């Protein structure tokens, strides 16, 4: 029997490139409702929206979602997640899945997969997903986070830079992917053991996390194991810009 899990969807109103992003309309529904709908199709026993904005809270209550108003000063989404887990009274061995509030096309199967992977790997405190990189442009794109794992599927590191750097191949040619190097793109969905979250918050950011702007590096910095599996379904891009929003609107028929 699969271990029960809770989904938390962090949703912030502030966005440099797309203010009010969670409330942007997509085919008659605010984006946050689209994400919530997808999460509810998963096997999660509970789906909760965590927001720092009264407008998002009101919208969620309007379409029937369970939502919490959190503090605004969190350093990262995981810090916000810890507040929610604490307020919900989740047990230390419970599993919580963090689904980003700007992923209206997230496949429910990936939510189930990441939760099941963490349940199946007791040596890890975090589980996440990845997929192959097929284009050299993605490898050199700092907005595409790369991940390298060990033989057991545990993360060695994450980076916005090409990872690994194929020294000899790139000395000859940077217009194509080197043969024999399994480059992988990290997919930003995480499952956590609730007991780990308090440690994560207490540690605070490390210099490596700050340099890359990747909060998962804080966990690796402290020796925490992160299990990384290949996603069973394709993860369509989320919404970061007005252009992304228009693309999703076309997909969903607006």
From Swiss-Prot:
Organism taxonomic ancestry: Bacteria, Pseudomonadati, Pseudomonadota, Gammaproteobacteria, Pseudomonadales
Role according to the record: Activates KDO (a required 8-carbon sugar) for incorporation into bacterial lipopolysaccharide in Gram-negative bacteria.
Molecular functions (GO terms): 3-deoxy-manno-octulosonate cytidylyltransferase activity
Keyword Transferase listed: yes
Annotated EC: 2.7.7.38
Keyword Repeat: no
Annotated compartments: Cytoplasm
Pathway named in the protein's UniProt entry: Nucleotide-sugar biosynthesis; CMP-3-deoxy-D-manno-octulosonate biosynthesis; CMP-3-deoxy-D-manno-octulosonate from 3-deoxy-D-manno-octulosonate and CTP: step 1/1; Bacterial outer membrane biogenesis; lipopolysaccharide biosynthesis
Record's protein name: 3-deoxy-manno-octulosonate cytidylyltransferase
UniProt record similarity statement: Belongs to the KdsB family.
Record-annotated membrane-spanning stretches: none
InterPro entries assigned: Cytidylyl_trans, KdsB, Nucleotide-diphossugar_trans
One Pfam family per UniProt: CTP_transf_3
Cellular component aspect of the GO annotation: cytosol
UniProt keyword list: Cytoplasm, Lipopolysaccharide biosynthesis, Nucleotidyltransferase, Transferase
Gene Ontology biological process: CMP-keto-3-deoxy-D-manno-octulosonic acid biosynthetic process; lipopolysaccharide biosynthetic process
Catalytic activity: 3-deoxy-alpha-D-manno-oct-2-ulosonate + CTP = CMP-3-deoxy-beta-D-manno-octulosonate + diphosphate
Top-rank lineage group of the source organism: Bacteria
């Amino acid at each position: 029997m699969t271990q029960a899990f809770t989904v938390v969807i962090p949703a912030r109103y502030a966005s440099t490139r797309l203010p009010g992003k969670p409330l942007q309309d997509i085919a008659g529904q605010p984006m946050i409702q689209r994400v919530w709908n997808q999460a509810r199709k998963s096997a999660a026993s509970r789906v909760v929206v965590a927001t720092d904005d009264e407008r998002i809270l009101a919208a969620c209550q309007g379409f029937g979602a369970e939502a919490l108003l959190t503090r605004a000063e969190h350093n990262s989404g995981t810090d916000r997640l810890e507040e929610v887990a604490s307020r919900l009274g989740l047990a230390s061995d419970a599993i919580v899945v963090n689904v980003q509030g700007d992923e209206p096309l997230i496949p429910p199967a990936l939510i189930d997969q990441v939760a099941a992977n963490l349940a199946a790997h007791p040596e890890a405190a975090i589980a996440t997903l990845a997929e192959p990189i097929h284009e050299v442009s993605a490898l050199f794109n700092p907005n595409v986070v790369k991940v390298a794992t060990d033989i057991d599927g545990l993360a060695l590191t994450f980076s916005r830079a090409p990872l690994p750097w194929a020294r000899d191949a790139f000395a000859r040619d940077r217009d194509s992917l080197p043969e024999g190097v399994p480059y992988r793109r990290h997919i930003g969905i995480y499952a956590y053991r609730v007991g780990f979250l308090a440690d994560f918050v207490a540690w605070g950011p490390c210099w490596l996390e700050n340099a890359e702007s990747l909060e998962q590096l804080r966990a690796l910095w402290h020796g925490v194991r992160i299990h990384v599996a290949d996603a069973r379904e394709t993860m369509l891009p989320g919404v970061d810009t007005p252009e992304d929003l228009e693309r999703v609107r076309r997909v969903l028929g607006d």
